[in-house]
């Protein structure tokens, strides 16, 4: 048998999903698993979206335009205007989820061997998309002790060389929940301008900012309009992960032209998903307000509960619906697997994502986990209690 590709062997396993077989086995044993590992909201999808799908009246479910339906893109212009992001429909390309938007950004803007600077910990699939594009991720460390704030500009400049082509940020951040300040965004702008880099900005969690601090989009940064590629998705905003609808947004016509070639090669974004996503823009204002309020309460429940467990520490996330917590364990990969394979308390256990998978620096995140607060408060409270019992019983606990 011929050998599989180097790309295939180097592709990292998802830290979010790699333990799923252990979770499935636990369920088969009758154990209830609290899923804290994945950002799958449990809140209902807007009724207008479900109704739009239910009422589809088409004789043919045809290919949609490769850039997405213009009616949807025109409605998105109004959505972004609410955040003072001024666009035209031509600036927006609809993608099969935010993931495809990231991949197409890399494919359109980077050559094999080009480097992207990414603050770590970072969303694990960025590495997978970089490998797919033949690019290289260079990470700049942020720490839990400093709340995952950005390091000084000099740390970025230490990484910049002739192969550096882009900086990638996620704001608010997955996995940390950190929200970049105006000073930090201006720092990134200045680097992009000074070294003529692309700025890829993943902003899918803009609705979920809990501190009263302003949301500063990469599109708000003056002087680098042609350098910015904005990544977006409806998955988290409307609890629509399964319809796979995202967007790639840029004012740079040359980037859009290159991206469109990849869009045409994959033919079209999902027709039914676009119907649901367009309808979601008409959701009652109470929908997003109630969703926001629910996550505010869940955040408080989770962070207060984590920091009451002996030996556990979590900073207070400012956005998204994740936190990275430090645990008193020797190895979070082993601990998370042990929770699923060897531990249960009163027929229950917890499924978390080991944070090491969100780092590229060897050894980083070894005693950290990412936790998503996408369960109702009653379940979060119980999951935290089960976690505390797991930490008491774990053979590799450290003080």
For each feature predicted by the language model, list its residue ranges.
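PLP-dependent class I/II
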Residues: 1-4, 8-14, 19-56, 86-399
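Basic nucleic-acid-binding alpha-helical/helix-turn surface characteristic of O6-alkylguanine DNA
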Residues: 59
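Conserved N-terminal alpha-helix of the aminotransferase class I/II PLP-enzyme fold
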Residues: 63-96
């Amino acid at each position: 048998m011929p050998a599989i590709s180097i790309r295939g062997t180097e592709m990292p396993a998802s830290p979010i999903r790699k333990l799923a077989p252990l979770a499935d086995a636990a369920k088969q044993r009758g154990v209830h698993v609290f899923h804290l590992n994945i950002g799958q909201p449990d809140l209902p999808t807007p009724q207008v979206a479900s109704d739009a799908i239910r009422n589809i009246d088409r004789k043919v479910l045809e290919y949609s335009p490769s850039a997405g339906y213009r009616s949807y893109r025109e409605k998105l212009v109004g959505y972004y205007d609410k955040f003072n992001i001024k666009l035209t429909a031509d600036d927006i390309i609809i993608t099969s989820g935010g993931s495809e938007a990231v991949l197409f950004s890399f494919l359109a803007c980077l050559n094999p061997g080009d480097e992207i600077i990414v603050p770590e910990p970072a969303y694990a699939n960025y590495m997978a998309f970089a490998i797919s594009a033949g690019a290289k991720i260079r990470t700049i460390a942020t720490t839990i002790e400093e709340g995952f704030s950005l390091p000084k500009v000099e740390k970025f400049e230490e990484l910049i060389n002739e192969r550096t082509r882009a900086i990638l940020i996620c704001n608010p951040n997955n996995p940390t929940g950190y929200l970049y300040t105006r000073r930090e965004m201006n720092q990134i702008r200045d680097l992009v301008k000074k070294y003529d880099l692309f700025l890829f900005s993943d902003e899918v969690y803009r609705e979920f900012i809990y501190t009263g601090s302003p949301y500063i989009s990469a599109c708000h940064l003056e002087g680098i309009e042609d350098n910015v590629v904005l990544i977006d998705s409806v998955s988290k905003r409307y609890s629509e992960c399964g319809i796979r609808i995202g967007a790639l947004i840029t004012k740079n016509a040359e980037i859009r032209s290159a991206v469109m070639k990849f869009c045409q090669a994959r033919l079209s974004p999902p027709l039914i998903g676009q119907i649901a996503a367009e309808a979601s823009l008409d959701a009652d204002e109470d929908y997003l307000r109630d969703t926001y309020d629910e996550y505010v309460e869940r955040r408080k429940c989770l962070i207060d509960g984590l920091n009451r467990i002996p030996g556990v520490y979590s900073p207070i996330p400012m956005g998204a619906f994740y936190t990275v917590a430090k645990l008193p364990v020797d190895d979070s990969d082993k601990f998370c697997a042990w929770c699923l394979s060897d531990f249960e308390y009163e027929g229950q256990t917890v499924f978390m994502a080991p944070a090491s998978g969100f780092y590229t620096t060897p050894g980083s995140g070894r005693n950290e986990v990412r936790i998503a607060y996408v369960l109702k408060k009653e379940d979060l409270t119980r999951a935290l209690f089960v976690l505390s019992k797991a930490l008491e019983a774990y053979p590799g606990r450290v003080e």
